[in-house]
């Protein structure tokens, strides 16, 4: 296993101890029943982590949607981080990243046949989703809600980054943990994400021992598989889609990211070209007119004829909102999609674990198979 350098600010340990005491007390109040977790009569799957930063929650949520939506009526509920609205909003054709948040909008854009909603109050959001009819919601995916213990999810999936395992980290602000590592015990499934494709068998064993999970917990490993570059503004682009392998070594790329950790996408692009100019913003960054001007300036410095703007799907949702974006840039902007791959030949086991939970925890104990369901 490759050595990962995790930056710990030791001088902030006293603040971390105070923070940890507060979080531990809150968790104990839930464990003792002093703070109430609410159960709902519908299968609820929570996807989250115990660290700040990107662990791949949205790609894993999309994996679950693909797995479930042919057989069940799926709804996704998020708080809609950095949206410009408040309260419960059910996504419609008029929704955008500003009204529901970049990640919910990305999901709705890719899966128009499911319900996507946002609400800071997850209990209220679930109650609203359960009032929907024609057809009723059959399973709810909670995005980034591992610490939201007011909802008692039936299945908790905890993600941890291969390059920053929670067992190597410490509490904020000295580290990046939202809660003590013991919080992992609430998860029924733990996934080590962003694994290198060539991860060695011995690394699986080392990580398994270090995470020290209980027998009731299932451990899986996943990696990212990148798709073809897709035009963000297809009406303006001469080429709608490009394979990564079509990139030439002399091609110059302006890479725009507003995600927590752009390292994986950089490594993927560097396989094809080393001419990468990175313009990195903070996670969920709302692009300003000044940012758009900077993008135009940086792109203008690249050699004409062999240049491209690449961004993530999440960042693309925020760029699309901007009427101020220079029209001359639009034909050159492409998004790089990400798909999740379950490693160790464990994909079938993982899929059956998820589907089995949903089938066993429906309102009637079982659901009739939908006529449009794909046979597996």
From Swiss-Prot:
Pathway: Glycolipid biosynthesis; lipid IV(A) biosynthesis; lipid IV(A) from (3R)-3-hydroxytetradecanoyl-[acyl-carrier-protein] and UDP-N-acetyl-alpha-D-glucosamine: step 6/6. It is an enzyme of class 2 (transferase). Its EC number is 2.7.1.130. GO terms for biological process: lipid A biosynthetic process; lipopolysaccharide core region biosynthetic process. The keyword Endoplasmic reticulum does not apply. ATP binds at residues 51-58. Transfers the gamma-phosphate of ATP to the 4'-position of a tetraacyldisaccharide 1-phosphate intermediate (termed DS-1-P) to form tetraacyldisaccharide 1,4'-bis-phosphate (lipid IVA). Belongs to the LpxK family. This is Tetraacyldisaccharide 4'-kinase. The gene is lpxK.
């Amino acid at each position: 296993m490759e050595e990962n350098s995790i930056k710990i600010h030791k001088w902030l340990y006293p603040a971390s101890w105070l923070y940890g005491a507060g979080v531990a007390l809150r968790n104990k109040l839930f464990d003792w029943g002093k703070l109430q977790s609410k159960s709902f009569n519908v299968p609820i799957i929570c996807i989250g982590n115990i660290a700040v930063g990107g662990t791949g929650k949205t790609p894993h949520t999309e994996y679950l949607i693909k797995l479930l939506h042919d057989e069940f009526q799926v709804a996704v509920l998020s708080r809609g981080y950095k949206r410009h609205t408040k309260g419960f909003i059910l996504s419609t054709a008029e929704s955008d990243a500003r009204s529901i948040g970049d990640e919910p909008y990305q999901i709705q854009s890719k899966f128009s046949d499911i319900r996507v909603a946002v609400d800071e109050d997850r209990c209220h959001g679930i109650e609203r989703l359960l009032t929907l009819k024609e057809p009723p919601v059959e399973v709810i995916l909670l995005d980034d809600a591992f610490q939201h213990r007011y909802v008692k999810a039936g299945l908790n999936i905890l993600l941890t980054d291969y390059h920053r395992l929670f067992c190597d980290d410490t509490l904020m602000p000295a580290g990046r943990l939202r809660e003590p590592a013991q919080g992992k015990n609430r998860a029924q499934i733990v996934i080590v994400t962003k694994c290198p494709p060539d991860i060695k068998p011995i690394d699986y064993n080392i990580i398994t021992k270090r995470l020290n999970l209980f027998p009731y917990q299932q451990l899986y490993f996943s990696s990212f598989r990148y798709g073809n570059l897709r035009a963000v503004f297809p009406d303006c682009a001469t080429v709608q889609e490009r394979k990564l392998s079509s990139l030439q070594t002399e091609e110059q790329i302006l890479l725009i990211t507003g995600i927590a950790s752009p390292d994986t996408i950089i490594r993927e692009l560097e396989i094809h070209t080393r001419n990468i100019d990175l313009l990195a913003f903070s996670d969920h960054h709302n692009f300003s007119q000044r940012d758009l001007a900077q993008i135009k300036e940086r792109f203008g410095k690249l050699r004409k004829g062999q240049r491209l703007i690449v961004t993530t799907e999440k960042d693309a949702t925020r760029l699309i909102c901007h009427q101020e974006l220079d029209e001359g840039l639009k034909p050159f902007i492409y998004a790089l999609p990400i798909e999740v791959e379950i490693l160790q030949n464990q994909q079938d086991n993982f899929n059956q674990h998820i589907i089995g939970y949903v089938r066993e925890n429906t309102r009637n104990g079982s659901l009739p198979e939908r006529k449009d369901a794909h046979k597996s």
